[in-house]
């Protein structure tokens, strides 16, 4: 075997490990959405540097749940990444009148599931009324 073939073989063997290492830590740095309810999560649980557009008063946060074409949001006030697939969240609505705990789980590379826990039920504006979101809601990565 020539030295060039040895180097090429070594690189090909290491390449999958390098790609996998780059994806580590990206599970909870994403924009994920639910088309059924027109809601989305913009999150970065690692750097916690997300700002809510038009509501910069909150400062940098782990993320928020927003509604398309609406400024209403549920702010993620704190989070704890348990592992690469699970994070626990504390959320509060932008009025400060309701709060809850929730769990966000990454099912695979593109599917996330938000499960509401103790506290209030997430409600979002929809055609002039409040719409309760289901206790378990699936999001897709964009």
Regions found by a protein language model. Name each.
Residues 1-25:
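Bacterial Sec-dependent N-terminal signal peptides
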Residues 83, 106-108:
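Residue-level recognition of beta-strand termini and adjacent short loop/turns
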């Amino acid at each position: 075997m020539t030295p060039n073939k040895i180097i090429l073989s070594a690189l090909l063997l290491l390449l999958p490990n390098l790609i996998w290492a780059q994806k580590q830590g990206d599970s909870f740095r994403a924009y994920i959405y639910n088309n059924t309810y027109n809601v989305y999560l913009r999150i970065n649980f690692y750097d916690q540097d997300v700002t809510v557009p038009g509501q910069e008063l909150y400062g940098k946060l782990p993320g928020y749940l927003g509604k398309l074409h609406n400024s209403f949001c549920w702010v993620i006030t704190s989070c704890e990444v348990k592992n690469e697939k699970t994070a626990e969240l504390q959320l509060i609505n932008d009025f400060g009148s309701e709060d809850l705990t929730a769990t966000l789980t990454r099912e695979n590379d593109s599917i996330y599931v938000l499960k509401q826990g103790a506290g209030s039920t997430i409600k979002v504006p929809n055609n002039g009324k409040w719409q309760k979101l289901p206790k378990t809601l699936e999001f897709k990565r964009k």
